[in-house]
Amino acid sequence: MASLGVYAAVTTLVALLLTYGIPLFLRECFPWQSLYKQRHGKPTVTTKSYEGRTVLITGANGAFGSRAAKLFAHRNVDTLVLVDVRDCGELKQEIEKELSDAGKAKPNILVWQADLMNFSGCQEVARKAQDLKTLDHVLMTMGILSFNRRVSPEGWETSIQINYLSGALLGLLLLPLLKSCSTNPNPPVMTFVTSFGIYPSSLTMGMPKNGSYLKMLSNNKDGMQQAHQYGRSKALLLYFTRELAERVSAVTVTSKLPHKVTINSADPGSAWTPLTAPNQDQLIPRLIQNFGSRAPEICAAALVNGVSASEDAHGKIMQDFDTTSYPPFMERKSGHVAQKRIWEETREEFEAKVPEVKAVYEMLDQI
């Protein structure tokens, strides 16, 4: 009889696990349906013309950034700003040749080489952007994926430096410069690139009771912790972007911003690129990558649509032609607490090292 009781208990436990436990785990850490949908999605650029507009792309030499630049160039963009740590001169020549061969007009292509591993590189880009007449679209595609821990000149683990801190700082510095041209019917858009990698990393995003949350995530070790750094850095960026969007909404109401601005995130989906190449040597990342991968050109089109969205996309995550929800852990009360903590710790770091960002924070202090 005792064995029958044990058998019944085990059977019940297994049934509960299959019915509730595994689906809950997948929803939290591996929503495979999203990957599957993106793998088979084939978005195309919905905006027919960018005539008169100015577009700035970071990570412009990357697989997504370079393809996005070409998509804009073939749609009559007026000024195309290519930002990367590597010289984008060759990309500029490729674009101009493609347009010449197609009998299309060439845009004004500006090549800004900047090392965004340093905050000074972000400041340099922002200073140059002050000379732009308009700034209709900012697409932040810069990013790194590293399975070996390194430290930036600013003292942060490099994934967190590039994927989060430098992108966030540059976004803040460019925010007051966003302005639509007369032929653009929508408010200017700033889009930060997010990633499915946030989900499997969510289990490692717990906050410490004491000390700096950002430092805890940055002071990681090689191995499994480093393997999650890409996802964790993207989670930080998504938290920041949501908070920034909320604050921009508040200051727009009070007219502290001269015009409406759309802040959103875009998920391009996954593709085999030089960025994701390190996954080839990692079994689980390689299997996940293979399950969801599609052509880089399709991913770039999704990003172009994201940064071309109307004001209805403010504060949302764009995915192909639609929006998608925030990860479950971000929607809980603890997620909103983490968001505020990240915002304040990031502010402390920036204001200590980048004096001009203080004015932007003061403008956003309305909530």
Language-model features: locations:
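Short glycine/proline- and charge-enriched loop/turn segments
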Residues: 211-222, 279-288, 326
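Non-transmembrane alpha-helical segments in soluble domains
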Residues: 241-245, 304-307, 343, 347
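C-terminal helix/juxtamembrane-tail motif
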Residues: 2-5, 10, 345-367
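Rossmann-fold NAD(P)H-dependent dehydrogenase/reductase core
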Residues: 23-272, 361
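Short aromatic-enriched loop/helix-cap "lid" or pocket-rim segments at secondary-structure transitions
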Residues: 124, 202-206, 275-280, 328-332
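C-terminal, well-structured subdomains that either form a transmembrane helix-short loop-helix hairpin
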Residues: 56, 234, 262-275, 279, ...
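C-terminal helical subdomain
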Residues: 122, 287-327, 336-338, 352
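Terminal signal-anchor or tail-anchor transmembrane helices
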Residues: 1-34
